């Protein structure tokens, strides 16, 4: 067997070490076998000496890990290895050659159940539970439903593409390898990665502000006695405290927040199904009544077939806010979760069920319980009513004669907004961390404490998210719409860059003959990614099409629709000029690094898999399949 250790990305012929193993000899009877390993130094890379110096330390760590896991395998009741043992041992600080301790790393404190629940509900916030009211009113039930199907079809290939790249090289805890900016820097171009990183950062902090703004409005459903600024302060402080804590605290909080959101949405879908068949207190069988009267499409711009098309297209632009950060959040956890390849692959595969069940079925449920011209809905949107006051689910439930449930749903909306803000804060800090580690942001932002928290990045993200205080002097609806519009286009640009990174990654994989070593492969690539890239590119350019109709022209809407594009281009071209790399707009395939760290992660994954015991019994098999 021949293993080629990582080589430098700028020289395909500077590979460091070639190992030849498994030379088998024995007598004719097949008795003893002899395994020899010859190590041949071909050309020493700068990092090979460091590997040799640390070999004894690494062997010692491996021995400790094997001993701890063997002692505790019997304690695992579901037949799988203990993830907490892996994370506790792998990322312990070991002494360096000169006696100093190594820099602190991110801790792999996220277990399988954390990653799976984050994948299912981590980024679901007010966009689905409240934001759909505006889309329903503007586009009609069919426009809402069809647009969410199209967005889901566009998003899933992106999730698969990011999952493939991150599962291949998930990082070792010293960086946030799963961030889209890091992938773009590594596989496309550092300048484009620079623009992508800062684009994502201000997208994330704006989303933190947007969700905290929405959460403050949700509380106003119950009382207006307390000023908005007080609620914003409370929500921001709780989010910051959770992100200043160890990552396992974040994972645990998101696990329970996501569980509440999932149970809430499942309950609302079931209740909508009951109302569909007339099971409410008034026994009014709804069916698809509202698809016929007032109609399936709202025709907000024009009538006929063109009106149907514009309703769907507007629904895509408006509805995309509910999907922002969904794929990225799953991959950003890769450097901080145990058994990285297995957990990220599982989360990526199951992402489709989140799209189908929550978004597609959720919007179908909304479309059958509320007409797009419902007086309560129209009045709530006109007055900017917060929280449950403008939620289409709540309006439909109230129309059915159910009294108490709206308050419960408002509580779920509050936890959803809070949870989404928590997730966006996590993403913003990891985005800053990645840029600091790749030289695209001040190095101080990359400082990590002994608990594995990038504390400087958390502090900076908190300061930027104080944009939420703009809500104190403006209505919740106006500020929320501004934030959502700007962050949605930033999300579009990030998705496009992720698609480009995957296409370059795929070329490099085939160039180096590594396709068979991909641990996670998805159907239809690269064609599905090309589909997503083209669709998102068209939407990004035309997202403000309606404002060019004279009667809809507003300068504020034009700025919100297109301000992100020049900012992104200035970041990209400015970095090119600053680094004087304008002659090369993307890395040649021969220079794309798809090998550094590959052997190590493959060996680690193989060790984990060999120690994994298959689940026994129905309960263990069910939990293994679920989480």
Curated annotation (Swiss-Prot):
InterPro entries: AA-permease/SLC12A_dom, Amino_acid_permease_CS, Amino_acid_permease_fungi, APC_YAT
Membrane topology: Multi-pass membrane protein
Basic and acidic residues composition-biased segments: 54-70
Ranges annotated as biased composition (Polar residues): 42-51
Cellular component, GO, one term: membrane
Keyword Glycoprotein among record annotations: yes
Gene3D superfamilies: Amino acid/polyamine transporter I (1.20.1740.10)
Pfam families: AA_permease (PF00324)
Location, primary (coarse class): membrane
Keywords recorded for this protein, A-Z: Amino-acid transport, Glycoprotein, Membrane, Transmembrane, Transmembrane helix, Transport
Induction remarks: Requires the presence of GABA.
Residue ranges of the TM segments: 115-136, 142-162, 191-210, 229-247, 262-281, 306-326, 351-370, 408-427, 455-473, 483-503, 522-542, 558-578
One Gene Ontology biological process: neutral amino acid transport
Molecular function, one GO term: amino acid transmembrane transporter activity
Keyword Transmembrane helix applies: yes
Residue positions the entry lists as glycosylated: 72, 78
Location of this chain's protein in the cell: Membrane
Annotated stretches, region: Disordered: 19-77
Family (UniProt): Belongs to the amino acid-polyamine-organocation (APC) superfamily. YAT (TC 2.A.3.10) family.
Function: Required for high-affinity proline transport. May be responsible for proline recognition and probably also for proline translocation across the plasma membrane. Also functions as a non-specific GABA permease. Can also transport alanine and glycine.
The protein's name: Proline-specific permease
